[in-house]
Regions:
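Carbohydrate-active catalytic/glycan-binding domains of CAZyme proteins
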Residues: 1-209
Length: 209
């Protein structure tokens, strides 16, 4: 399991969240990723390697592990438990460059499907893009953007104003869906996502090519 959170060298944080973020960023800290392993799904042992990116989603190809994280950055490691080395942005030279919030990954042969939402969209909603997994991973690029889900129901706050989303957390209901995760079982695919910004969790069955 890969987890992320604000990381420091052990210094004590300010108590209030807004002050803590300002304090951490001024010292070069950020939301980083670590792996944790478990044999029973209950008790986990945190691994020492720290990857300096957040919201990392990982898949294995050949002898390497690859991850895609916030903003669409792709990275590589020789082991899924090692520190990942940053590479290019999958979304470079696209309208989503630097705006990708969270991603979900599905591998189909030599193609990677990336489900994501983008900061600044009105409304923020889920898209799918395709990445052809050519031999040189520095050449991987996202293309072919398809809308998967957009807020349409009351539990997704579709009745609220249609405003561009912003980076960071949100503590009030808004017309946005975020944070996709794709789960496949017995030939069916479901996407789990947060609703009204970050006020709930929903799921929908989708067609995954």
């Amino acid at each position: 399991m890969w987890t992320h959170g604000w990381w420091t060298h052990g210094e004590r944080w300010p108590v209030k969240p807004a002050e803590a973020r300002t304090w951490a960023r001024a010292r070069g800290y950020g939301q980083y990723t670590q792996a944790a392993v478990s044999t029973d799904g209950v008790h986990f042992t945190v691994q020492p390697a720290i990857t300096k990116t957040s919201y990392l989603r990982v898949f294995t190809r050949g002898s390497s592990s690859f991850g895609v994280s916030r903003l669409g950055l792709v990275s590589r490691a020789q082991s899924p438990l090692a520190e990942f080395t940053p590479g290019p942005n999958l979304f470079r030279e696209t309208p989503y460059a630097g705006r990708v919030r969270h991603v979900a990954l599905v591998v189909r042969g030599n193609r990677l499907l990336v489900f994501f939402t983008a900061i600044g969209d009105a409304p923020e909603r889920i898209f799918m893009s395709k990445v052809e997994l050519v031999a040189d991973w520095s050449e991987w690029r996202a293309s072919g953007f398809t809308e998967v889900l957009t807020p349409e129901t009351a539990y997704e706050c579709a009745n609220l104003p249609n405003l561009p989303s912003e980076g960071g957390d949100i503590n009030v209901p808004v017309k946005q869906i975020r944070d996709p995760f794709v789960f496949e079982d017995a030939g069916r695919a479901f996407v789990f996502y947060s609703t009204c910004g970050e006020q709930g969790i929903a799921a929908a069955e989708i067609d995954v090519p």
